From Swiss-Prot:
Described purpose of this protein according to its UniProt entry: May play a role in ciliary assembly.
GO cellular component, one term: cilium
UniProt-annotated location(s): Cell projection, Cilium
Listed name of the protein: Centrosomal protein 15
Transmembrane segments: none
Disulfide bond entries: none
Entry superkingdom: Eukaryota
InterPro entries in the record: CEP15-like
PANTHER family: CENTROSOMAL PROTEIN 15 KDA, GENE, 49355-RELATED
Keyword terms, alphabetized: Cell projection
Length: 128
């Protein structure tokens, strides 16, 4: 009976050791999990800060690019814009005539007298 009692005491102590070790391991796991959450939150904050910084840098680069573009290619003068507008209007006006000529359905779209008119118009525009 004493051997059973001694064995019971030994098993009880072993049980207490296992339970205390289990509690210690659970506490370590909780601490580790808390540290991981803290680290993850810190990483998330770092990522958000980097994203905002990158977005700001991108906006600055785009603004600098736009500024350089306007320096390299300034807006054309009003006379140039006017000439360009009239040129494209003329192109659109004569496209149907040229289209028929190129398809072989009509003669050459400009006669000699039309060429003289065009030259006179160009000279008049140049004198303005």
């Amino acid at each position: 009976m004493t051997s059973l009692f001694a064995q019971e005491i030994r098993l009880s102590k072993r049980h207490e050791e296992i339970v205390s070790q289990r509690l210690m391991l659970l506490q370590q796991m909780e601490n580790k999990l808390g540290d991981q959450h803290t680290e993850k939150a810190s990483q998330l904050q770092t990522v958000e800060t980097a994203f905002k910084r990158n977005l700001s840098l991108l906006k600055d680069i785009e603004a600098a690019e736009k500024s350089l573009q306007t320096r390299i290619h300034p807006l054309p003068r009003p006379e140039v814009v006017s000439l360009e507008t009239r040129y494209w209007a003329s192109v659109e006006e004569y496209i149907p005539k040229w289209e028929q000529f190129l398809l072989g359905r009509a003669p050459y779209p400009f006669a000699v007298e039309n060429q003289n008119e065009a030259e006179n118009t160009i000279q008049n525009e140049a004198q303005r």
